[in-house]
Amino acid sequence: MASILHYFLALSLSCSFLFFLSDSVTPTKPINLVVLPVQNDGSTGLHWANLQKRTPLMQVPVLVDLNGNHLWVNCEQQYSSKTYQAPFCHSTQCSRANTHQCLSCPAASRPGCHKNTCGLMSTNPITQQTGLGELGEDVLAIHATQGSTQQLGPLVTVPQFLFSCAPSFLVQKGLPRNTQGVAGLGHAPISLPNQLASHFGLQRQFTTCLSRYPTSKGAIIFGDAPNNMRQFQNQDIFHDLAFTPLTITLQGEYNVRVNSIRINQHSVFPLNKISSTIVGSTSGGTMISTSTPHMVLQQSVYQAFTQVFAQQLPKQAQVKSVAPFGLCFNSNKINAYPSVDLVMDKPNGPVWRISGEDLMVQAQPGVTCLGVMNGGMQPRAEITLGARQLEENLVVFDLARSRVGFSTSSLHSHGVKCADLFNFANA
């Protein structure tokens, strides 16, 4: 009798697996790149994506967090999948996720609630709330592409993608509406880039091209995009990449170093002259983040920055500031805003240019504000480059060689938007 039950159980699992395979295909060529379409949330300025997960596959909307350690989703409501598993405590999967905490849930078994599993701490990057959840594994599917075409390829799968089933309170504040979790792109072992690179044999590298416009999509491209997507509409959109060293903080955050700031070629000051009050910070430490929409500056940097910026524009154009911004203008009295140059790494290092358009925010009809925030005396970094500074720009995170590449000219100068890179119609 036991052998008969075992036979029917095996047959059932095989049928489930075959049903799952019908939603995806096995590629006939080596996979060079995989692509995650990403959207701009108009109400928050943050970016989110629909991940294809579970069996049968369904779309799960998640916030994109550049510095997140792993993927976490809310499993407490309507998580249904034929392929979900919870690895046992002290298993290989738990070691890979760098967690040695055992967790047992006394309620009936369901995704996120099992006995003798691994506990994994997840963080809402907007509210900084944390919550302990169950380490789980389930199917994840993502679009493959060869890079030589704008068409998104078929869905390819990671059958046992590791993630956290986080408590539901983590999604209740701060995230874009209807999102059910966070996709971490950080440096941790089970982050999205590291698991995809390991499973598909990709280079440990990903490129962001975030759309500025809520009505169109951008993309995160995993793999060596600069060498596989060079020819786009008969032009090399990666030809002007400049690179700067990438460091990882103790918290696992992506950091680069800014040596100095210039506004319309007027020097703000070299950052190594700042007496930093940030614990554990090195002078010029700059975090790159998608969990804040705007640039954030340590207070002394902010004060000098806004002073020099205001000096480049007619004083009579200034108007009363609109919270949360500190410097605002009558947009009808200004034709163009000054550009900002971040001199990277060393005095003669490459220049990351941010156009005036990329810094300004329309706060009210006829009122435009400098989208730079005062981070106080002890922010997480002296400078934080927010999502808006990454938009409509190719930014390459080369984890294998510990460097970040950025375009020294905007995509707009090529007549291209992030939405043009792929045909997102069916994504």
Swiss-Prot record:
InterPro entries: Aspartic_peptidase_A1, PEPTIDASE_A1, Peptidase_aspartic_dom_sf, TAXi_C, TAXi_N, Xylanase_inhibitor_I-like. SUPFAM superfamilies: Acid proteases. One of its GO terms (molecular function) is aspartic-type endopeptidase activity. Keywords: Disulfide bond, Seed storage protein, Signal, Storage protein. Residues 1-24 form the signal peptide. Coiled coil: none annotated. Residues 47-407 form the Peptidase A1 domain. One of its GO terms (biological process) is proteolysis. It comes from the Eukaryota. Pfam families: TAXi_C (PF14541), TAXi_N (PF14543). Seed storage protein. Has a protein kinase activity. Binds leginsulin. The mature protein consists of high- and low-kDa subunits linked by disulfide bonds. Belongs to the peptidase A1 family. This is Basic 7S globulin. The gene is BG.
